UniProtKB/Swiss-Prot annotation:
Listed name of the protein: tRNA(Met) cytidine acetate ligase
Keywords, in A-Z order: ATP-binding, Cytoplasm, Ligase, Nucleotide-binding, RNA-binding, tRNA processing, tRNA-binding
EC number: 6.3.4.-
Source organism (scientific name): Streptococcus pneumoniae (strain 70585)
GO annotations of cellular component type: cytoplasm
EC class (word): ligase
InterPro entries assigned to the protein according to its UniProt record, in alphabetical order: Rossmann-like_a/b/a_fold, tRNA(Met)_cyd_acetate_ligase
Gene Ontology biological process terms, A to Z: tRNA modification
Family: Belongs to the TmcAL family.
Residues that hold ATP according to the record: 7-20, 96, 152, 175
Catalytic activity: cytidine(34) in elongator tRNA(Met) + acetate + ATP = N(4)-acetylcytidine(34) in elongator tRNA(Met) + AMP + diphosphate
Length: 365
């Protein structure tokens, strides 16, 4: 049987995600971000709600990406997620992308010339942002051009790099309907960005979300809910460079900007430079919010939920893969657990995220 991996955020889960799961074959394993997203923001609804949405709509097994994999630039995000899925035995990786290319050929190219390609990136001037450097590399070695508004294509290239040299086939699926950041409401498939923006529009949600009731019952948060906490962390920390990935230049800019910024958005605008993209700045602010430190990634994989088919697969992995199904009895990842506690501060109604929580079981799919 084919075992298909999907790397996702489901922030929130929508019809485009359901379409992706429908296109996947065999047993479907999702490696999903926890409560903080790749581009440096809190998830609109918590990880358990999103895992349940996925399981109700075609996923067989949902596991959690640790905080220091979830909140990373595309390459590290892709690498960390593929590592986890590889250990769970996937033989193909399905992903949505704005432009379907021969990603397999790109992965093979990276297998062959990876060292040379990374050397090329290292030698580029530091005035360029990391995404600009990566794009120059792909242009140079694979003749790829970027239109700018294609974050899924950028992630797809990160996945191609991550599967290089592994026995995993890449299956790109053409992204349906609205673009990643689109807030357009007149499309067949709305983007997660649009759903977050129109979260109070009942008709809109019902048109584009398969698990509306779950979404509506869940506590919802946005970055601004954490702004007072972020501000406190910045003002009370005498040395921000002790925080993961915060260098002297960024520490100075953030300390200066917090004096006048009235919102997270304003803070991001003030700190962003040509070299430091908004996504990178948001990630740094997320690290500051949760006081992230450089840490080894957990050996074990945290299971958020499964169907009967997923349970059987987990059973077959016993003894080969270290799995955690209940945090408390077994510790998992201190960094992620701390991030979850801080996520809960966004709204008093957010449920406990770890202790005593057991995987969601969906009997039928």
């Amino acid at each position: 049987m084919t075992i298909t991996g999907i790397i996702a955020e489901f922030n929130p889960f929508h019809n485009g995600h359901k379409y992706l799961l429908d296109q996947a074959e065999g047993l479907k394993i999702v490696a999903m971000s926890g409560n903080f997203m790749q581009r440096g923001e809190p998830a609109i609804v918590d990880k358990w709600t999103r895992a349940q949405m996925a399981l109700e709509n075609g996923a067989d097994l949902v596991v959690e990406l640790p905080f220091l994999v979830s909140v990373q630039a595309a390459d590290f995000f892709g690498q960390g997620a593929v590592d986890i899925l590889d250990r769970l035995g996937i033989d193909s990786l399905v992903f949505g992308t704005e432009e379907v290319r021969d990603y397999q050929k790109i992965a093979d190219l990276y297998t062959e010339k990876g060292a040379e390609m990374e050397k090329f990136v290292e030698n580029l001037p530091d005035s360029l942002s990391y995404p600009q450097k990566t794009q120059s590399m792909w242009k140079e070695f694979a003749g790829l051009d970027f239109s700018g508004n294609t974050p899924n294509h950028v992630l797809a290239l990160a996945y191609a790099k991550a599967v290089a040299g592994r026995n995993i086939k890449l299956h790109p699926i053409q992204r349906q309907g609205a673009g990643y950041h689109s807030v357009n409401k007149d499309v067949d498939f709305a983007s997660a960005t649009a759903l977050r923006q129109h979260q109070k529009d009942q008709d809109f949600l019902e048109r584009f979300m398969p698990s509306v009731a779950l979404f509506e019952q869940a506590s919802k948060v946005i970055w601004e809910d954490y702004f007072p906490l972020l501000r406190y962390q910045i003002l009370s920390n005498p040395d921000l460079t002790t925080i993961y990935q915060v260098n002297q230049e960024m520490a100075v800019r953030i300390k200066e900007a917090i004096k006048t910024a009235q919102s997270v958005e304003e803070l991001v605008e003030l700190v962003t430079t040509k070299r430091y993209t908004k996504a990178r700045v948001r990630r740094l602010l997320t690290y500051i919010l949760v006081q992230a430190r450089e840490n080894v990634l957990p050996e074990a994989i945290h299971v958020l939920g499964f169907t009967e088919k997923g349970r059987q697969h987990l059973k077959s992995l016993k003894g080969q893969v270290n799995l955690v199904s209940r945090i408390g009895k077994e510790p998992w990842d201190a960094m992620t657990q701390k991030a979850d506690q801080i996520y809960q501060l966004g709204k008093p109604s957010i449920a406990e995220q770890n202790f005593g929580r057991v995987p969601i079981r969906i009997e039928t799919n």
